[in-house]
């Protein structure tokens, strides 16, 4: 559990927050949480909103004209729990509740805690088969050196979705294999709930359904029924929400977005899902601004590990898990390659974040190949260092990059902020460099390069990884890059003289 405590410390160390940015993905969920607690309504344009701007990511109820988040309500429900807790704590201490403090609690419940729960559960489940040290290194890579680190700092719902979907799929696999209906039902319920947080989780459904049906044919029909019944529960509730707000169980907020640009995009194909295209594939996997291979270049190694496990001899549980996780990952890749929009403010490919935990399982196998071979160790450590540094800078400093006016976010945003000594809200205002070093040292300790040659290769790998980060300066900056950075610096919190003023969320008079 010491490694989990270390992850918790690094995830909680920094609170990157700038109230004036009005984060379009977070603000509607925050307003929905407030409205639900204060007024009992999920609409965000009533008195519970307290006059705060909703941003563009909203939809209009065609029946009554009310405004709602254009996303499913799952993250808003978690935000409501955070708001109720923060409101109760404020009442107990006599301090006013601010939007900043409420946001911290919401991000804790919807970002940090799901990430820690996911890592702890995966370690307990797979460490006996893959080795504790190797599994914790894989989980460290996932939590610190992929975009999961940035989204753990936000109320986007991506980490909550990843936790629900991954745990749900794993419980379904184990439940079906052992013919345990209750476990399968719990797994189905968690996987179904993931769709209630993020619609894109539904694209993982066919892979899981194929597995369930294949085991039903082997006689595990009780578990198969359990999984289907479990999934039906949250999906039915989501359909009832859609019917109540938008007039039909299959009518979503995306059908009724109020922003004209969003409406045009979602009006193409099936809510913006069109035929696969090279442009979309490049955007989500290859582009230096937000592609997977830039923000998690060790992903191919993990996919190779999943492929190797999925082809294993015998009928092991690991093989089943690897097949399901690999299939879900590839299904989301195909969905991303078919989107006609890029994802707004983001770090890396945000629509793949729900299935990034699959990489942890793949690394759990593939790390055995790194072994003590100096060349492999050096290359691995170089890419690990690069990944940890850029994801750490993004997650701790500015986890919602608007790539409209950016060619290379590392050189145009993250490194300039770090060089200028910009520090988010941290304990005693301590800078983030120490946290980055601590994370890198932790991963190196878990890697434990053995012979002298491998240790030297690891040291050279660290230097090479840092060199890669510095080399991003070779990218030609966007013509509007300087203006974009100036805006970030203008709204930066905390200012030099302490905490910025935050909106006070006064209790509503009954």
Residue ranges and their predicted role:
Residues 2-5, 91-98, 119-144, 162-163, ...:
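Transmembrane-helix signature of polytopic, membrane-embedded enzymes
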Residues 33, 138-139, 143, 183-198, ...:
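Membrane-interface alpha helices of multi-pass inner-membrane proteins
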Residues 174-177, 203-235, 239-240, 303-317, ...:
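Perimembrane helix-loop-helix junctions
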Residues 223-305, 322-336, 386-405:
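Membrane-lumen/periplasm interface segments of specific transmembrane helices
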């Amino acid at each position: 559990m010491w490694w989990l405590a270390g992850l918790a410390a690094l995830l909680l160390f920094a609170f990157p927050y700038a109230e004036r940015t009005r984060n379009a993905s977070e603000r509607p969920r925050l307003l929905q949480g407030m409205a639900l607690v204060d007024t009992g309504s999920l609409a965000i344009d009533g008195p519970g909103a307290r006059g705060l701007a909703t941003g563009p990511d909203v939809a209009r109820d065609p029946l009554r004209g009310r405004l709602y988040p254009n996303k499913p309500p799952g993250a808003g429900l978690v935000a409501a729990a955070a708001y109720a807790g923060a409101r109760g704590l404020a009442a107990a201490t006599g301090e006013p509740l601010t939007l900043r403090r409420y946001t911290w609690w919401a991000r804790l419940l919807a970002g940090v805690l799901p990430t820690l729960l996911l890592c702890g559960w995966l370690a307990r489940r797979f460490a006996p088969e893959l080795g504790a040290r190797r599994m914790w290194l894989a989980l460290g890579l996932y939590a610190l050196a992929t975009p999961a680190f940035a989204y753990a700092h936000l109320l986007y719902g991506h980490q909550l979705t990843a936790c629900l979907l991954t745990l749900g799929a794993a419980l379904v696999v184990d439940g079906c294999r052992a013919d345990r209906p209750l476990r399968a039902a719990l797994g189905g319920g968690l996987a179904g709930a993931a769709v209630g947080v993020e619609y894109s989780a539904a694209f993982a459904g066919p892979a899981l359904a194929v597995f369930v049906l294949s085991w039903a044919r082997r006689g595990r029909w009780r578990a198969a029924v359990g999984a289907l019944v479990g999934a039906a529960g949250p999906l039915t509730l989501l359909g009832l929400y859609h019917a109540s707000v938008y007039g039909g169980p299959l009518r979503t907020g995306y059908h009724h977005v109020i922003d004209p640009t969003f409406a045009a995009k979602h009006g193409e194909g099936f809510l913006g899902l069109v035929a696969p295209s090279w442009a979309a594939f490049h955007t989500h996997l290859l582009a230096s601004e937000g592609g997977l291979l830039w923000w998690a270049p060790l992903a191919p190694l993990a996919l190779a590990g999943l492929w190797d496990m999925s082809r294993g001899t015998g009928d092991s549980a690991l093989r089943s898990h690897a097949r399901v996780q690999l299939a879900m990952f590839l299904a989301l890749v195909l969905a991303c390659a078919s989107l006609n929009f890029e994802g707004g403010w983001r770090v890396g490919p945000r629509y793949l974040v729900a299935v990034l935990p699959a990489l942890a399982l793949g690394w759990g196998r593939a790390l055995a190949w790194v072994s003590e071979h100096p060349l492999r160790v050096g290359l691995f450590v170089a890419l690990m260092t690069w990944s940890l540094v850029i994801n750490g800078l993004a997650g701790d400093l500015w986890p919602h990059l608007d790539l409209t006016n950016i060619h290379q976010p590392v050189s145009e945003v993250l490194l300039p902020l770090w060089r200028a000594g910009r520090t988010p809200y941290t304990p005693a205002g301590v800078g983030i460099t120490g946290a980055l070093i601590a994370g890198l040292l932790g991963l190196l300790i878990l890697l434990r390069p053995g012979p002298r040659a491998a240790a030297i290769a690891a040291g050279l790998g660290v230097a090479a990884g840092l060199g890669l980060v510095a080399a991003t300066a070779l990218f030609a900056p966007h013509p509007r890059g300087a203006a974009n950075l100036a805006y970030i610096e203008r709204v930066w919190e905390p200012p030099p003289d302490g905490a910025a003023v935050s909106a006070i969320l006064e209790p509503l008079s009954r």
